[in-house]
Design a protein with these regions (language model features):
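Bacterial N-terminal signal peptides
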Residues: 2-14
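Generic secretory/membrane-interface signal
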Residues: 8-10, 19, 140
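Sec/Tat signal peptide C-region and signal peptidase I cleavage site
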Residues: 15-21
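Exported/periplasmic ABC-transporter solute-binding proteins
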Residues: 21-154
Length: 154
């Protein structure tokens, strides 16, 4: 009986589009003290290619990414319309030309993302919405939070 109820609950969860969207959405997170509450998709692209260097108010932006193969990285590459090799070449060229001081900080886990958010007040990162931790502030993308219909980062 309990097994049947558990399986029924899992089936209902898997058929719920809202629950499915929330589990596959990638949130844009910043440090809790960051005054940002919303970012346009275009500005997010500019941010993650290093074209935007500071938040409104002057705080320097620090890009924090997950490694290749992670869902967050897949969404980042989709956002930037780049392959993994193009992304690596892009950042190598940015640093070589002096247009960036360093490549984005790449971390292997959500726990390390959280720690980086604490260490760098201007940090911004992409995090699977179900993995958002205390100390990470989710901001809207084009006025929408993860889980909303039409949310862009899936």
């Amino acid at each position: 009986m309990i097994t049947t109820l558990l399986l029924l609950g899992l089936a209902i969860f898997s058929l719920n589009p809202q629950a499915m969207a929330q589990s596959s959405d990638i949130a844009v997170v910043v440090s809790p003290d960051n005054p940002a509450t919303n970012v346009s998709l275009g500005d997010l692209r500019k941010t993650f290619v290093g074209a935007k260097h500071s938040w409104p108010g002057g705080q320097a932006i620090k890009l924090i990414t997950r490694g290749p193969g992670c869902p967050e990285r897949v969404v980042l590459l989709k956002l930037l319309a780049m392959s993994e090799s193009e992304y690596k070449q892009y950042w190598t060229a940015q640093v070589f030309r002096g247009e960036a001081d360093a490549e984005p900080l790449t971390v292997p886990s959500v726990g390390m993302q959280k720690e980086a958010m604490r260490l760098f007040p201007g940090a911004v990162s992409l995090v699977n919405a179900r993995d958002v931790k205390p100390g990470m502030k989710v901001i809207k993308v084009d006025g929408l939070l993860p889980g909303a219909a039409g949310y862009a980062l899936r």
